[in-house]
Amino acid sequence: MSGTVTMHSVFVYGSLMADDVVRLLLNRIPQTASATLPDFHRFSIKGRVYPAIIPAKSDKVSGKVLFGITDDELNVLDEFEDVEYERENVQVLLTDSSDEKLQTKTYVWAKKDDPDLYGTWDFEEWKQLHMEGFLKMTKEFAEELNLPKSEI
């Protein structure tokens, strides 16, 4: 008798928009779709290379949704995001399908009034300046969790 498998969708807006990072963590690239999260802002964080989002009226965050995430994969993402983020249910707009609304999960910065949040984090800048080092850190993280090895 087989149990039901719950599949999740997760809106990502920072380092997890990079397929290479996701592959190291999940050992695969899930199906994705471009999406926008309304009423949030993506901040840079002093001393960090990854971003944080917190609620912000009349703002929006561009990212993508990862589909078909298993419970085990969601647990890996929870570990990766650590205690600085809280997993929350949000509604995003899928930008590839005439702004269809989708309920999904995302990781919101836990400390809403953090003085270390500033400006706007830029994915393209991160890819150029920090992705290589971030991939090394992610690979070490995956090895610590004894995740299956990904061929990058």
Curated annotation (Swiss-Prot):
The keyword Disulfide bond does not apply. The keyword Amino-acid biosynthesis does not apply. Keywords: Acyltransferase, Transferase. Its EC number is 2.3.2.-. One of its GO terms (molecular function) is acyltransferase activity. Belongs to the gamma-glutamylcyclotransferase family. This is AIG2-like protein D. It comes from Arabidopsis thaliana (Mouse-ear cress).
